[in-house]
A protein has these predicted regions:
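Glycine-rich adenosine-cofactor-binding loop
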Residues: 222-248
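Amphipathic alpha-helical segments at domain termini/boundaries
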Residues: 33-37, 77, 83-192, 210-223, ...
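Conserved N-terminal Rossmann-fold NAD(P) cofactor-binding segment
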Residues: 257-298
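Long amphipathic alpha-helix in the N-terminal Rossmann-like dinucleotide-binding domain
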Residues: 1, 118, 192-203
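Short beta-strand element of Class I
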Residues: 251-253
Length: 298
């Protein structure tokens, strides 16, 4: 399956006519890999538009060329965090990273993509490659490339303790592509995909993914009642986490006997809101609104 998919996407990548990807909504996993095979990528700035390679979270590796084309687009240091963590990014951040070439309004995606395709065809538009960092440029050379990948392997080993094979496989595919070219890297992807897909680690992570999604579904019996105010007893790790994820839904009161615990919870919640603002998940105004709904008391 991986070999056939890679062969098809390589036909897109090497097509003599320009192919433009118009992304509106989620482009995750194979969806992003199709876009990466195109010559130009547009994305809408709709809140629902997210891009990423989450396969590693299921014990798999991207098997449609992302270990090669994402590195080609954004460089090693930009691609590895996305490939090794499954991080998802919104359209504007994807533009800054170099994953997409342009961002447009939700209503203008198709029209803008058509204009881009025509401009690429007549030569009036050329894709501007991302300006690589000094480290990424150095990573193209054998001695420093080895150091970058060695550091990445050591970090993966510390974080996974050798229990998850997918991140190691991803690094090997990236290294193969850098050393021997995209064709060899794609072949390496396909070699790894089968054993990972049927391995116990991936099967367990896939089961857990489905179980967590099932647990999020509402109970079939009984009528849900609106939550006007949520009370949380205890401002520890669990309590502050519950408060943080609930602030967007209703006012939250956190109660704890220790002032120190309440102060720590406030810092944790504030940092969580700042991260959401930085990742453009919510606006600064929305973060302030949610923070105003939080009450800490003894």
């Amino acid at each position: 399956m991986s070999r056939d998919g890679n062969a098809l996407l390589e036909r897109i990548a090497t097509h003599r006519r320009p192919v433009v990807a118009a992304v509106h909504g989620a482009a995750l996993g194979g969806g992003l890999e199709v876009a990466l095979a195109c010559h130009y990528i547009l994305a809408s700035d709709d809140p629902a538009t997210v891009l990423g390679q989450p396969e590693v979270q299921l014990g798999l590796l991207p098997a449609g060329g992302a270990t090669q084309r994402l590195v080609e687009r954004v460089g090693v240091t930009g691609a590895l965090p996305l490939l090794l963590t499954g991080q998802r990014v919104r359209a504007r951040k994807a533009r800054r990273l170099g994953i997409v070439d342009a961002v447009t309004t939700p209503g203008g995606v198709v029209e803008t993509a058509c204009r881009a395709a025509l401009a690429l065809a007549d030569g009036s538009l050329r894709r501007a490659p991302k300006k690589l960092s000094l480290l990424d440029r150095a990573a193209r050379h054998v001695p420093l490339r080895g150091r970058v990948l060695k550091a990445a392997r050591e970090q993966v080993r510390r974080q996974t303790r050798g229990l998850y094979p997918a991140p190691v496989a991803i690094l090997d595919c990236v290294e193969t592509g850098l050393k021997r070219g995209r064709k060899a890297g794609l072949a390496r992807e396909s070699e790894y995909f089968g054993p990972l897909a049927v391995g116990q680690v991936s099967r367990s992570l896939v089961w857990m993914f489905h179980a967590m999604n099932e647990a999020k579904k509402p109970l079939r019996d009984g009528e849900p009642r609106p939550v006007r105010r949520l009370g949380v007893l205890g401002a520890g790790f669990m309590g502050s986490g519950v408060a943080s994820v609930s602030l967007g839904l209703s006012p939250v009161v956190v109660r704890d006997l220790a002032d120190e615990a309440l102060a720590a919870a406030a810092r944790s919640i504030d940092e969580g809101l700042r991260k959401q603002v930085r990742s453009e998940a919510i606006s600064r105004i929305e973060a302030d609104r949610r923070r105003s709904w939080l009450e800490l008391t003894t």
